[in-house]
Amino acid sequence: VNLKKAIIESSDVYFYELATKTSVDKISSFLKSFGFDTITGIDMFGEGFGILPNRKWKLGNIGESWFVGDTVNLGIGQGYITTTPMQLAVAVSAIANKGKVIRPRIVEKVNDVYTSPEVKGEILLKDISDWMTMEKAMVDVIESWQGTAHNLFVEGDLRLAGKTGTAQIKSLFEDDLTVKEEYLDIRKDKEKRDHALFVGYGPVPDPKLTVVIVIENGESASTIAAPIAKKMLNSYIKSKS
């Protein structure tokens, strides 16, 4: 399994191994450049920072050292990390804009004088072609039969780039149950079910809109969250045509 295939099929194992080969310090530093662990600057009061954990954060807030298992969790966006939907939107927009991190704004309409995009920063990669590699993988999340959101693809339809995800809100810790048994037990209480997420942008190759869908306790990103994102993108494109 390579990186592209891991993104398309959402392979946790690949990212477990990648995280342990990197380090929590490098992962946290790179994620910070996408806007995590800071407010986005949108014109709203009370915006949250989220949590971007590292060794210092865990020692200060949990009172424990950082373990390899924590890095493994961070590698798939689980564990101590928390984000806001707006932070996710800024991060996904950075991929769409090939590294440019844009400050989100609330506006009535767009004009060049007052609402031109404000670039907060730029993520510099050693190989800029990696942005296109990421975009192709996110397109295949939808267009490939192996993609976790392949149910969205319609031949001849507008091309979208996206990624499904789930946010686990209930830890698995029952020693006397298998993982499957514990998940089935968790599902009995709807409020403990995983959140369903989908992030994406389109149309590719000239994206105009980024969408982030979070369905609390929705469980299935591909069948619940992703179709909502597609409807939003379709409606936006139709309104501009």
Where are the language model's segments positioned?
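Beta-lactam-recognizing serine transpeptidase/beta-lactamase-like catalytic domain environment
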Residues: 1-212
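Short, gly/Ser/Thr-rich active-site loops of penicillin-recognizing serine hydrolases
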Residues: 115-123, 227-241
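A generic structural motif
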Residues: 216-219
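Short amphipathic alpha-helical face segments that pack within enzyme cores
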Residues: 84-90, 224-231
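Short acidic, gly/pro-rich beta-turn/loop elements at beta-sheet edges
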Residues: 209, 221-223
